[in-house]
Amino acid sequence: MCGEYILITPAKNEECNLPEVIECVIRQTKKPVLWIIVDDGSSDKTPDIVDDYCRRNSWMKKITLPPHPRDITYHYSYVCSEGFKYAVDTCNALDFHFDFIALLDADTEIGQDFFEELIEKMNDNQKLGIVSGGIYHRIQDKIVFNGADELLPAGTGRLWRKSCFFETEGYLIEPSPDSISNIKAVLRGWETKQFDTIVAIERRDTRTAEGYWKGYRIDGRTAYYFDKHPLLVLIGFINFSVKSPFYPGFGYLFGYIQGWLGKTEKIGDPEIRDYYRNRRLREYAERVKF
């Protein structure tokens, strides 16, 4: 039975969240053989916190990148990519065996058997290439599921089968790299799944790190960059507009229109563009058939 994994965590100015996240991983019933925390040029106590834990846990390592403004598009994927490269190179150099590759953001709390349960799901179904837990948020003292599609693994609390990770070109330096990874996995015959019974609590919605409007506007520009069919954009607008605080849908639509008016460059990967132009619409159509 496969079971060893490596873990990557990107962190920038996370002194308030990181200690609890680290404790969550230390308490795991199945710990990673190697955990790389990538300090993205933090200006708070994040580096000191990580250094202290690394001194006490030999399977934890830190790498530090130069200071850079917070950026949830290209730079985030670059930070994660650097962590994955370092982790794989370290395992190869030290002859560490691993079967899976995991990503956990520095603001995501997980239960002590989180990764063990995901690994069990993978071992039960060898066709699964990418899985994640369900993403929940604390809203007015309640833990609320974000309602994401069960076939789309989340970006955090995420686990790749090693062979799937490399077959899908690893973690590409692109906006929404988790979405690209999901698509490439499906196009290569892998199954993907988000398990809402395996709980991951995200302390903040990734899109809201710089405010709802800016976060969803970036999502809209990314939709244009991916060459999403206008019907998919309309579905996204409606979905983001029917839930409190309601206005993010307009930010999303505004971002898409910005990309269209500015004739922003689109992604060069033809299979991603074809997926969002054609296959994704067919998937929606299949789901609404009676």
Model-assigned labels for residue ranges:
Residues 215-290:
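Non-catalytic, C-terminal membrane-associated alpha-helical segments of glycosyltransferases
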Residues 171-237:
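Catalytic donor/gating beta->alpha subdomain of glycosyltransferases that bind UDP-sugars
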Residues 58-98:
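Active-site-proximal specificity loops/subdomain of glycosyltransferases
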